[in-house]
């Protein structure tokens, strides 16, 4: 349709404006690759830190963020199966500086997960941590377009999917989120009883 053609033209134009080239300084490309590949590790570090900090509220938030993140990635899988959208390098557009499988580009899993976590934290009133994750999310979105493995609209899709997952997650949470959290706390306390007893971890 003319509308979709206009969207794709805009998508390609913005991509080419943001995408690195062989003339781009090597340090900037290296920074882009580093952010694109490894900034996502903030998610497990943050969730584990939230859990280990102790307190039912923080642990419930860690479980809720995990639930929303998994929901968002699940939605992405369904979209990827239902509609294949080639990555830039798969159709010879721009320059690529990171080896990647030619699977569907839309939406970006990295940006979806980071958006889902940041939205969950912000909706729970954790403004500082939520904004930190959101700033990493923006950096990752830029980096993955910059190094040529995603389109700008893959990032727009990520925000939409993450928002949808947050809404679904809050509905599911009301049906038994705290019950699941309490069950996980019980398992944690039993599995790590010795370590908790030695006061190396918070109960």
Which stretches of residues belong to each language-model region?
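N-terminal transmembrane-helix/juxtamembrane module of multi-pass inner/ER membrane proteins
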Residues: 1-42, 77-103, 184-203
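Membrane-helix interface segments
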Residues: 25-27, 56-61, 125-131
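Alpha-helical transmembrane segments
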Residues: 35-39, 65-66, 111, 128-132
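Interfacial segments of alpha-helical transmembrane regions
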Residues: 46-75
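Transmembrane alpha-helix boundary and packing residues in multipass membrane permease domains
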Residues: 46-49, 77, 119, 167
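Short helix-capping/hinge motifs at transmembrane helix termini and TM-loop junctions
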Residues: 53-54, 83-85, 147-151
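Small-polar-interrupted transmembrane alpha-helices in polytopic inner-membrane proteins
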Residues: 66-81, 130-143
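Membrane-embedded catalytic cores of phosphoryl/pyrophosphoryl-handling enzymes
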Residues: 98-203
């Amino acid at each position: 349709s003319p509308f979709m053609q206009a969207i794709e033209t805009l998508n390609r134009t913005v991509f080419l404006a943001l995408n690195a080239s062989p003339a781009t300084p090597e340090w900037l490309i290296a920074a882009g690759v580093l952010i694109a590949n490894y900034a996502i590790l903030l998610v497990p570090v943050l969730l584990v830190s939230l859990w280990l900090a102790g307190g039912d509220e923080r642990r419930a938030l860690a479980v809720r963020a995990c639930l929303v993140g998994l929901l968002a990635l699940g939605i992405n899988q369904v979209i990827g199966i239902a509609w294949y959208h080639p990555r830039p390098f798969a159709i010879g557009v721009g320059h690529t500086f990171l080896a990647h499988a030619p699977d569907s580009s839309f939406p970006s899993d990295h940006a979806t997960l980071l958006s889902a976590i940041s939205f969950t934290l912000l909706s729970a009133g954790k403004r500082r941590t939520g904004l930190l994750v959101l700033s990493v999310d923006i950096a990752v979105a830029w980096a993955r377009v910059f190094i040529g493995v995603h389109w700008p609209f893959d990032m727009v899709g990520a925000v939409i999917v993450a928002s949808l997952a947050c809404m679904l997650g809050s509905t599911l949470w009301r049906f038994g989120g705290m019950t699941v959290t309490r069950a996980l706390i019980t398992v944690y306390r039993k599995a790590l009883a010795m370590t908790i007893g030695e006061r190396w971890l918070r109960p």
